[in-house]
């Protein structure tokens, strides 16, 4: 018989640097999960990724206080900022543009995020990423 699911916890944790401090500790502690066990497992799974990259993680907590977790790809905004070499997006994206990004790079990001996105096809996912780029003040060039 399958274990009874007690809760789902969604967090964004930097790759390779999960530790018991907030937000990880309090979120897992109130559900009775072994925090250090999660931190060690998460850091082991993300050790090959770029250090400090924000990784969305969904933790499934079971009634016996055991857990499983699933990592997702980094947020599109983070991937766009690193691809364009920016520190942050534009505070006024409609009037103040902060950089440019090639359409080929946007499509590459869409293909990377395809597993986590619910788009019908790669073109739709690419358009979605282009919209995110525009809302950050990036100009998408051919």
From Swiss-Prot:
Family: Belongs to the universal ribosomal protein uL11 family.
Statement: the UniProt record of this protein carries the keyword RNA-binding: yes
Keyword Secreted in annotation: no
Binding partners and assembly: Part of the ribosomal stalk of the 50S ribosomal subunit. Interacts with L10 and the large rRNA to form the base of the stalk. L10 forms an elongated spine to which L12 dimers bind in a sequential fashion forming a multimeric L10(L12)X complex.
SUPFAM superfamilies named among the record's database cross-references: Ribosomal L11/L12e N-terminal domain (SSF54747), Ribosomal protein L11, C-terminal domain (SSF46906)
Role played: Forms part of the ribosomal stalk which helps the ribosome interact with GTP-bound translation factors.
The protein's name in its UniProt record: Large ribosomal subunit protein uL11
Annotated PROSITE patterns: RIBOSOMAL_L11
GO biological process, one term: translation
Keyword annotations: Methylation, Ribonucleoprotein, Ribosomal protein, RNA-binding, rRNA-binding
